[in-house]
Amino acid sequence: MAKSSGLNTRRTLARVSAAALTAALVATGSNAVAADTPAPSLASADVPAKASGTSKFAATAEAAYAPINALYAVDKNGEVWAYPPNGEGGLDTRSWAGSDWQDVRQATQADHDSDGLADGAWAAVGNQLHYLPFDSDSILVGNGWNIYNRVTSAGNLGGAGADDLLARDGSGVLWLYLGYGNGKLTQRYKVGSGWNTYTHITGKGDLTGDGKDDIVAKDGSGVLWLYKGTGNYKAPFQSRTRVGGGWNTYNNVVSVGDIDIDGVTDLVARDKNGALYLYKGTGSASTPFKSRVKIGSGGWNTYRLMF
């Protein structure tokens, strides 16, 4: 992979910060990115930053926590586009964020300094996993990653501080890699088998209000399931609970954090007609999402990856 990741992150990060200002947050920024074979490029979007540079909101004494990131989308030509939150419950106009992503199979954002803003992204390219920081050259994490058909980071699942990575292999076994905070990963730990029943696995932060990062998974029948996090890498999830059915109307489900800037992680879903819907998080395990709100009328089927 070439050293430049092609991710143009500075402008996107600035726009995300602008959205946060409407929620009385302090803006921050970041630089352009890099990566290695055929070099995907990525830029950080302007995201809304948190108060005092931390991942806590200043509005309440016991402020809610949720990461705030742009939604990145990769089109069929390998171009990457960034959609930061607009501070009004939706997404801002897209901006170009990178190129040469034709060979990227999976991608997911990661926050390594626990400030609530992504610092870069892991990208599975062929049989390699690369980490693309927003402010320096890419890092080759390892080889042999073509055994995985799903790679996603839901946040800090193991309790150590930095974001971790989940990977599902072809036989349906889900594995957890703990993050060192620099893009590198520990050895893998087995989460469990039978995960090939799910078409989508995603998450970005705490969905249930207990301070532990969670995930949701959509099965082939269209049922969405919640896996509450434990914060223990040896057993990172509790038993699943049903969120609801009818999710087979969507061909993509992804979480990048808090879209509506209310301090709670949200979920985005794209239907088969290319419309985009936002499911606002509630922070409650019994009913983790509010009713959907359309935030994109069409055209989202042009993207083969969203992260």
Feature annotation, model-predicted:
Residues 2-307:
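Trp/Gly-enriched beta-strand/coil motifs that build multi-repeat beta-propeller-like domains
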